[in-house]
Amino acid sequence: MREELNQGLIDFLKASPTPFHATASLVQRLEAAGYVRLDERETWHTEANGRYYVTRNDSSIVAIKMGRNSPLHDGIRLVGAHTDSPCLRVKPQPELQRQGFWQLGVEVYGGALLAPWFDRDLSLAGRVTFRRDGKVESQLIDFKAPIAIIPNLAIHLNREANQGWAINAQTELPPILAQFAGDERVDFRAVLTDQLAREHGLNADVVLDYELSFYDTQSAAVIGLHGDFIAGARLDNLLSCYAGLQALLNADTEETCVLVCNDHEEVGSCSACGADGPMLEQTLRRLLPEGDEFVRTIQKSLLVSADNAHGVHPNYAEKHDANHGPKLNAGPVIKVNSNQRYATNSETAGFFRHLCMAEEVPVQSFVVRSDMGCGSTIGPITASNLGVRTVDIGLPTFAMHSIRELCGSHDLAHLVKVLSAFYASRELP
């Protein structure tokens, strides 16, 4: 089971270079399992024990397995994650021609570790909006091949490189895509038009706009002398999206189960499809009883907010509280912060720990050092907007927000097992 899950994750990561592609990958797997799309612009007709999903902006998704038991009586079981990861996004007018090289200007999305982006074989993917036969359409594209690189400056020309180097995102991050002689000009939108024709057989009259991100073409892999680790891009937080999906597909229960994967977590979640937007609540209000009964249902429900945790790094162990250093391959981590950067409380933490113990899954705790700031997740945002009890958890990870992150190869199976138990739980606290 472990090897199968890990390979499934690797395949999912490869198919999901952007939030748009991640959502499409989730949709593909849900539809294969019998889930039916609900269109937000139409009237919904649902039934007990039905399986449905809703997307917004092509980058966020809510999947629902309706239970035969009344949500008003038993509550609902929610797992939340996010589809986006820090990256380099192409600017609207990106063309740069310097010293005979054709480059694209980029904007840093989220809190990316920038140095690892240098000297990597990069490709480009995302969503393109275009006009065809007088109609405006959108399509996902993925060049897949390594078409760009951001070469480092040789140490001979930057002797201070190993003593700390502040990277200028405006001048030092534009990737190189080609070299030209003379005054030859390249129209980036024409390149996208060609890609639409090549990848989808679409003859666009004009490319109107796009949302495109560079990504590392190196596939994720199980690595280590004994295969102890998984290295790959976008583990934060596609790892949790995939674990939540597998648990939902495993769910054979009479209870109502929900998986929500939001976009824009890495930039604050404030969007129509982000966790700080109305998507989840609007979806639930259309599926659950109204008014007083809706509030009662939510108060009987529980959200597991799944987002990667910081594993204790052997070279930087002092960056962790001495008593709270989560280890790779030692199970999911319950994340706690007294300032509500995480939504965990003693009741929700206790219930998650109870699930882990019942499933014989190891479990750990994380709290940030008292002299350091703490990151956050969709947990507190969803809890405050929806009023649902929440526990923040995640799998320990190294190099979070790097172009290539690292997690334990045993932990995915641990997380899927406990999330499956959560979906199957007959009673919530």
UniProtKB/Swiss-Prot annotation:
Keywords assigned by UniProt, alphabetized: Aminopeptidase, Hydrolase, Metal-binding, Metalloprotease, Protease, Zinc
GO biological process: proteolysis
Any Pfam family matching the protein: Peptidase_M18
Enzyme Commission number(s) from the entry: 3.4.11.-
Cofactor(s) the record lists: Zn(2+)
Superkingdom of the source species: Bacteria
InterPro entries membership: M18_aminopeptidase_2, Peptidase_M18, Peptidase_M18_dom2
GO cellular component: cytoplasm
SUPFAM superfamilies (UniProt xref): Aminopeptidase/glucanase lid domain (SSF101821), Zn-dependent exopeptidases (SSF53187)
Molecular function GO labels: aminopeptidase activity; metallopeptidase activity; zinc ion binding
Residue numbers binding Zn(2+): 82, 156, 401
Stored PANTHER family: ASPARTYL AMINOPEPTIDASE
Family the entry assigns: Belongs to the peptidase M18 family.
Identification of the protein by name: Probable M18 family aminopeptidase 2
Gene source species: Pseudomonas fluorescens (strain Pf0-1)
